[in-house]
Design a protein with these regions (language model features):
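Residue-level recognition of oxygen-bearing side chains
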Residues: 50
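RNA-contacting regions in translation and RNA-metabolism proteins
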Residues: 1-43, 53-77
Length: 77
């Protein structure tokens, strides 16, 4: 899941070298923290939050297939 999210987010942003994704698996729960350059926050969030909602939806579907609960956070680095 980490590789897919990294690929998608790096394709959107202007500073792909500043994208960092940390994934922690805690039994039935996965926590993913995405960090991007402050200038790229708007691009990742998208108009009305459409981009980040689509990314979250896709990540949640993958988590459901693995029978895990997912926590996804987006922060500036």
């Amino acid at each position: 899941m980490k590789k897919l999210l990294e690929y998608l987010i790096k394709a959107i942003v202007d500073h792909p070298d500043k994208v960092k994704i940390d994934e922690k698996n805690l039994g039935e729960e996965s926590s993913i923290k995405i960090r991007v350059h402050p200038d790229d926050m708007g691009k990742v969030i998208g108009k009305g939050g459409k981009i980040i909602k689509a990314i979250r939806r896709m990540a949640y579907i993958l988590a459901i297939k693995k029978k895990k609960r997912l926590i996804l956070e987006l922060n500036e680095s």
